[in-house]
Each structure stands twice: as structure tokens, then as C-alpha cells.
From Swiss-Prot:
The modification Phosphothreonine is found at T100. It comes from Mus musculus (Mouse). The keyword Transmembrane does not apply. Residues 65-290 form the OBG-type G domain. SUPFAM superfamilies: P-loop containing nucleoside triphosphate hydrolases, TGS-like. Belongs to the TRAFAC class OBG-HflX-like GTPase superfamily. OBG GTPase family. The gene is Drg1. Mg(2+) binds at S78, T98. InterPro entries: Beta-grasp_dom_sf (IPR012675), DRG (IPR045001), G_OBG (IPR031167), GTP-bd (IPR006073), GTP-binding_2 (IPR031662), GTP1-OBG_CS (IPR006074), P-loop_NTPase (IPR027417), Small_GTP-bd (IPR005225). This is Developmentally-regulated GTP-binding protein 1.
Length: 367
């Protein structure tokens, strides 16, 4: 591993020395591709020894969503977690064998949300220092990441944590690059750009792909893409996770400073100690998770509004709903009756491909 780390340090130093302009874009693109390949070696080392990157530090996924809390020691992360779990927890004592710092599962708006403390994100975690690599491997499985920062020194910590997560293939609050990429057997590199490109040209694209030993491929750039965007698509192992920056200890700043923080995107100011602004934080968590609640209505009975079936926003068809209840239900499915925003008439008869919306009511009719 030390050889890989030395190569990474070498490339990073060369990138820092290189001025960024049109003339150096090609060279920088090449360096970035080499860096990404070396980082991948760290994430998934060659050879079988020592288990996977998350070995000994994983926990069964329970509930409808998983939130990872990341932050430096002494920023108030533990206080926030225990107070959140204490106030909103459905189960106060939640048992995990390998991860003792998990306070539990909270229930909010009918959904069960698992809270995970991810300790040890320190500078150099992505380079294999401490337990940082195992922690970030678990972070990759989260539906939402909360970066907890001390309001008195937020920017330095924010940058370090973001760099660690980025280096492990986690992209915060961003969408996958709009790039079409398809390898083929022959025909060379065929590059199509549907809009003007400020950074990538044919030569840079070819050299980045050559670094991956790819000499035949169709590449379509549908937005103004960077070398990093292309590398992310070629690597194919990136995860795109929403993130909220929780600025703690607001009892130590002025009202004027608080007003400024409120205008920063993706930020929620709180005081974990005094439990200030927890409602705002939970509402933002709910918005970012984009969960969809579906209520069930047994035939001849009133809908059950106490325990919704909770679906991720990307999988909300009637078939997805059936699979969440029981995989055999779809085999017996005839049609469904739906009440709510997803239909024009209440109730409306729909098939398994119908897309449901939050707080719809559904009744399944079997064959």
C-alpha cells in the first residue's frame, strides 16, 4: 500500500504545481485519470487478504432509510445523535455487535430511519489511515449523509471531510454526469458533443481512455463536462448521495451570523446541547430522503394511516409496493384500487406499472 500512497502523493504534488489553463488541460486530465486508478487500488486492494473495505465495521440495514453522521471529534456529533434518538427514537437501546456507537432507529412521519455514527473520518482516511476506509465504505451505503460541523470553524473541517468522501467515490449533492459511454470492439474513439465544451477535447478524451487501456468506445458529452466527470463515468463505481451540513453550537454566535448561515445551501444551524432547531433539521432530512408513504386499505375497511409502507422515490410503482409487502403478492395480483394524488378519479383501477405518490391509499385485488 505504501507504494501506491507514494505514487498518489507524487501525482497530487505535480497537479498542485501545474497551472490550470487550456494548454495544460490535457496533461491534468491524464494525471487525474492516473490518480483515480490508484485510489481505486486503495479502495479495493488486489489479493484476498484482510476482507473487504467495510469488514468488521458494518451493520445490518434496517428501516426505510439509512443516515450516516460524519464529523470531527468534539463537534457535538454524539450529543446530536443521542438527543435525536432520545427524543424521536422508537427503540432506545438498539443492539449492534460491531458498531457500538449507533443510537438506534428514529420514527418520523411514519418512516423508520436508521442513524449511523461514522467515526474516524480524519484527513487521510481515503488513503487507508486509521479505520477511515472502513467507515467511508459504510458511508457509501447511506441514503443521506449529515456532515456535523462546529459553527466556529466550519470551512476547514468541511473541506477535509468532503475531500475524504470524494476520494472514496462519494459525490455529495450532485447528479451523475450526463455522459454516454459505451465500449466496443473496434472503430476507435468516437466522440460526440451535443453542446460546447470548455475543458474536454478529442485529444484529452482519448488520453484519459488510453490510461484505462480503452481504445474503442462511443462517448457522448451531453453537457459541458470536465475530466473528472469523464473519469467518474469510466470508473463506474461512484455513488451520488444527498448531504446536509449541520452547523452545531449556534448558541455561541450572534443573530446576524445565524441569518447568514440560514442562506447557505444544504445547511441547517442547530444547538445539539439545547436541542434548538431539531424540527427544521428533521424536516430537511425528510425532504432530502424523498421517501414515499403508501397507506393500505383492506377490502371493506378504513385505510390504515398508522403504519405506511415506505418506498424510495426511485421505486414507487404498484409492483414495487407489492414486492415490499411480499414477493409472492405480485404473482397473485389482479389490479389495484388507488385513492390520492397519482390518480384522476378516487378510487381508480390501476395496473402494476402505475406510479404511486406520497400518501396514496391502495387496495390490492388478487386473482
Amino acid at each position: 500500500m505504501s507504494g501506491t500512497l507514494a505514487k498518489i502523493a507524487e501525482i497530487e504534488a505535480e497537479m498542485a504545481r501545474t497551472q490550470k489553463n487550456k494548454a495544460t488541460a490535457h496533461h491534468l486530465g491524464l494525471l487525474k485519470a492516473r490518480l483515480a486508478k490508484l485510489r481505486r487500488e486503495l479502495i479495493t486492494p488486489k489479493g484476498g487478504g484482510g476482507g473487504g473495505p467495510g469488514e468488521g465495521f458494518d451493520v445490518a440495514k434496517t428501516g426505510d432509510a439509512r443516515i450516516g453522521f460524519v464529523g470531527f471529534p468534539s463537534v457535538g456529533k454524539s450529543t446530536l445523535l443521542s438527543n435525536l434518538a432520545g427524543v424521536y427514537s422508537e427503540v432506545a437501546a438498539y443492539e449492534f455487535t460491531t458498531l457500538t456507537t449507533v443510537p438506534g432507529v428514529i420514527r418520523y412521519k411514519g418512516a423508520k430511519i436508521q442513524l449511523l455514527d461514522l467515526p474516524g473520518i480524519i484527513e487521510g482516511a481515503k488513503d487507508g489511515k486509521g479505520r477511515g476506509r472502513q467507515v467511508i465504505a459504510v458511508a457509501r451505503t447511506c441514503n443521506l449523509i449529515l456532515i456535523v460541523l462546529d459553527v466556529l470553524k466550519p470551512l476547514g473541517h468541511k473541506k477535509i471531510i468532503e475531500n475524504e468522501l470524494e476520494g472514496f467515490g462519494i459525490r455529495l449533492n450532485s447528479k451523475p454526469p450526463n455522459i454516454g459511454f459505451k465500449k466496443k470492439d473496434k472503430g476507435g474513439i468516437n466522440l460526440t458533443a451535443t453542446c460546447p465544451q470548455s475543458e474536454l477535447d478529442a485529444e484529452t478524451v482519448k488520453s484519459i481512455l488510453a490510461e484505462y487501456k480503452i481504445h474503442n468506445a462511443d462517448v457522448t458529452l451531453r453537457s459541458d463536462a470536465t475530466a473528472d466527470d469523464l473519469i467518474d463515468v469510466v470508473e463506474g463505481n461512484r455513488v451520488y448521495i444527498p448531504c446536509i451540513y449541520v452547523l452545531n453550537k449556534i448558541d455561541q454566535i450572534s443573530i446576524e451570523e445565524l441569518d447568514i448561515i440560514y442562506k447557505v445551501p444544504h445547511c441547517v444551524p442547530i444547538s445539539a446541547h439545547h436541542r434548538w432547531n431539531f424540527d427544521d433539521l428533521l424536516e430537511k432530512i425528510w425532504d432530502y430522503l424523498k421517501l414515499v408513504r403508501i397507506y393500505t386499505k383492506p377490502k371493506g375497511q378504513l385505510p390504515d394511516y398508522t403504519s405506511p409502507v415506505v418506498l424510495p422515490y426511485s421505486r414507487t410503482t404498484v409492483e414495487d409496493f407489492c414486492m415490499k409487502i411480499h414477493k409472492n403478492l405480485i404473482k397473485e395480483f389482479k389490479y389495484a384500487l388507488v385513492w390520492g394524488l397519482s390518480v384522476k378519479h378516487n378510487p381508480q383501477k390501476v395496473g402494476k406499472d402505475h406510479t404511486l405518490e406520497d400518501e396514496d391509499v391502495i387496495q390490492i385485488v388478487k386473482k
